[in-house]
C-alpha cells in the first residue's frame, strides 16, 4: 500500500542564516531531565520484564512522573540535606496478564533507583530520597488498540504527530558537544561539576553567547576562591569545545547569578537543584533531539516514558528526527529540512495520515532535484518503523 508522502519547498531563510537564534539544553541532572530519565528507565525496564515473562511488550505508559524538591544546607567542604527529594512514579502499566500477576511497581521502583545512582552519584538514596509508585492500569479502549497481532504492524494509539528537522546549526552543535564533553571528559576529572547543568545559547548575527548554569558539589570546594577557579575552568573548557564547532565568535558565561559570597553561589550537596527548591516534570525539558529550540518546529509531547510499540508521541518524534538527519547526510542539496509525521488512531503506524517533508534547497538546487531521494528515505524509514521500537528497548535511542 502506497504512503501519503508529500515533499515541498519551504520558502524561508534557513535558521542558521537568520539574525537571532535561541537554543537550550537541560542536562542529565536538571530536575526536568531527571524526571524524563526516570520515566524512560522505568518504561524500558517494564518492556524487558514483559518480554522475559510473556515474550512481548504489554501496554504501559510511564510519562507522568514528578520530582518534588527537598531542602538542603550546602557549604564549603560539604553540607547536608535537610528534607529528602520526593519522586512520584505515575502512569499506566499492565499488572496482570493471562491470569499471571506482574510485579510492575517493584520493577519500576528498582529501575528508577538504579537510574538515579548513575546520574546522581552524590545522592544517598537511603537518606536523601523518598519514592512512591502510583502506576495504574490503562483504559480498555487503548489497551485493545495496543494488542499486537502476530506479524502485524502495531496500530496508532492516538491521532498525533511527530516533528523534527536537520541539520543542526552551529549553536546547536556547540551546546550538544559541550554537554557531552562535560559528562564524558570533564566531570570524571573534576567531580565538583554536578550533573544539573543548563546551557542557554543566543546567536546574534555571527556572535554566539552561551550562559551555563552548573551546580557545584560542595564537598569538592574548599573556599570561595576555589569555587571561582572551578567556575573559570568550566568557562575555559566550554569555550574550547565550542570553537571546534563553529568559526563564529563565542562568549561563555558561567553561573552569572553568583554574588561571590558563600550564601549566594550555585553550591549544592548532591549536584542537583532538586535538593533545594527546583521541581521537575516529565516532558517539560528537552525534545527528542536533546534540545529546546524555539526557532524550530517542535512537538509538545513528552517522548520519555511512552510505550515504544504504538505511542505516536514517542515513535514519530524519534523517527522524524532520524529521517531528517538521514536525508541531509545522504542527499545533496538540502540546506534545511523539516519532517512531520501525522498518525490516525487505530491505523497502522507505518501508514501515517501524512508524512510531510519541507525543504529549503541549497543554491543551484531545486526541490525537484531532491524529492525522489527524500521520498525513498522517508518511505524506507516507515517500512522499517518497528526498528525504532527495538532500539528504544535496547536503550540505543535517546529521548531527551
From Swiss-Prot:
Keywords: ATP-binding, Magnesium, Nucleotide-binding, One-carbon metabolism, Transferase. InterPro entries: AdoMet_synthase_2_family (IPR027790), AdoMet_synthase_3 (IPR042544), S-AdoMet_synthetase_arc (IPR002795). It catalyses: L-methionine + ATP + H2O = S-adenosyl-L-methionine + phosphate + diphosphate. ATP binds at residues 136-141. Its cofactor is Mg(2+). GO terms for biological process: one-carbon metabolic process; S-adenosylmethionine biosynthetic process. NCBIfam families: PRK04439.1-3 (NF003364), PRK04439.1-5 (NF003366). Catalyzes the formation of S-adenosylmethionine from methionine and ATP. HAMAP family: S_AdoMet_synth2. This is S-adenosylmethionine synthase. It comes from Methanospirillum hungatei JF-1 (strain ATCC 27890 / DSM 864 / NBRC 100397 / JF-1). The gene is mat.
Amino acid at each position: 500500500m502506497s504512503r501519503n508522502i508529500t515533499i515541498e519547498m519551504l520558502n524561508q531563510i534557513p535558521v542558521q542564516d537568520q539574525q537571532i537564534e535561541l537554543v537550550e539544553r537541560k542536562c542529565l541532572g536538571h530536575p526536568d531531565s531527571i524526571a524524563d530519565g526516570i520515566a524512560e528507565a522505568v518504561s524500558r525496564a517494564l518492556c524487558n520484564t514483559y518480554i522475559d515473562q510473556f515474550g512481548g511488550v504489554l501496554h504501559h505508559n510511564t510519562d507522568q512522573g514528578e520530582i518534588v524538591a527537598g531542602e538542603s544546607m550546602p557549604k564549603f567542604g560539604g553540607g547536608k540535606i535537610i528534607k529528602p527529594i520526593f519522586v512520584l512514579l505515575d502512569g499506566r502499566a499492565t499488572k496482570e496478564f493471562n491470569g499471571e500477576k506482574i510485579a510492575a511497581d517493584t520493577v519500576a521502583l528498582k529501575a528508577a533507583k538504579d537510574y538515579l545512582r548513575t546520574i546522581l552519584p552524590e545522592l544517598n538514596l537511603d537518606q536523601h530520597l523518598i519514592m512512591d509508585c502510583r502506576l495504574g492500569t490503562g483504559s480498555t479502549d487503548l489497551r485493545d488498540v495496543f494488542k499486537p497481532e502476530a506479524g502485524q504492524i502495531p496500530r496508532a494509539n492516538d491521532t498525533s504527530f511527530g516533528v523534527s528537522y536537520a541539520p543542526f546549526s552551529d549553536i546547536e552543535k556547540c551546546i550538544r558537544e559541550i554537554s557531552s564533553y562535560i559528562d564524558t571528559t570533564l566531570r570524571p576529572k573534576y567531580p565538583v561539576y554536578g550533573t544539573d547543568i543548563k546551557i542557554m545559547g543566543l546567536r546574534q548575527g555571527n556572535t554566539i553567547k552561551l550562559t551555563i548554569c552548573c551546580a557545584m558539589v560542595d564537598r569538592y570546594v574548599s573556599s570561595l576562591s576555589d569555587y571561582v577557579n572551578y567556575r573559570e575552568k568550566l568557562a575555559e573548557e566550554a569555550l574550547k569545545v565550542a570553537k571546534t564547532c563553529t568559526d563564529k565568535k563565542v562568549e561563555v558565561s558561567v553561573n552569572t547569578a553568583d554574588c561571590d559570597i558563600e550564601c549566594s553561589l550555585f553550591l549544592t550537596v548532591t549536584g542537583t537543584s532538586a535538593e533545594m527548591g527546583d521541581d521537575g516534570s516529565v516532558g517539560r525539558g528537552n525534545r527528542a533531539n536533546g534540545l529546546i529550540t524555539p526557532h524550530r518546529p517542535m512537538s509538545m509531547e513528552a517522548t520519555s516514558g511512552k510505550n515504544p510499540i504504538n505511542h505516536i508521541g514517542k515513535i514519530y518524534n524519534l523517527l522524524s528526527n532520524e529521517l531528517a538527519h538521514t536525508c541531509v547526510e545522504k542527499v545533496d542539496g538540502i540546506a534545511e529540512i523539516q519532517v512531520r509525521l501525522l498518525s490516525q488512531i487505530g491505523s497502522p503506524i507505518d501508514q501515517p495520515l501524512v508524512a510531510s517533508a519541507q525543504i529549503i534547497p541549497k543554491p543551484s538546487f531545486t526541490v525537484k532535484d531532491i524529492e525522489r531521494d527524500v521520498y525513498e528515505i522517508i518511505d524506507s524509514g516507515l517500512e522499517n518503523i518497528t526498528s525504532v521500537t527495538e532500539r528504544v528497548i535496547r536503550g540505543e535511542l535517546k529521548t531527551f
